[in-house]
Amino acid sequence: MIVNELLKRYAAGDRDFEGLDLQGAYLSKVNLPGANLRRVDLRGANLTGASLQGVNLSYADLSKANLNGANLSGANLEEAKLEATDLRKANLIKTNLKKAKLTGANLKEASLMFANLSQANLDCADFHGATLHQAILHRASLRNTDLIGAILQETDLRGADLSQACLIRADITKAVLMVADLTNAVLLGAELQGADLSGATMPDGKMHD
């Protein structure tokens, strides 16, 4: 579908665009709040600065798409593919990313407060300076993930795999890391005050009491 036609339909009140092929589409600064984009193919699309609040992008493919500065607050991205996607400075507050694939994604300085990333694959993703305050990362995979300077205050990381993750200067105050795997993780300068590490595997491979 031509982008102009999509925008005309949206302006006319249509919100259902499920399954569309928008691969490589130019949608920079587009306004589509509340749209149904379930299973849409947006691989390589340009969505910089887009307003996508409350959008349904579940099962959509946004691999290698550019969402730099996009607003996805409250959006549903459950089981969406966001591999190598540019999400720098994106607003992902209260976004549902359960079981989403974000391997190699760039989330530098992104806002993920209260987001649900449970069971998501975040291996090798870049969360440098990102805010994940009170986010849910229960059983998420964060192997080799860059969390330098990230804010993880009161974040739920129960059972998460943080092996070889870089948490230098990360704020993990009051986070819950019960049974998490921190094998070979780098915690230099990290703030762990009040964090629950019960049963967690520490960087040296030993289990925390």
Question: Language-model features: where?
Answer:
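Tandem repeat scaffolds
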Residues: I2-D209
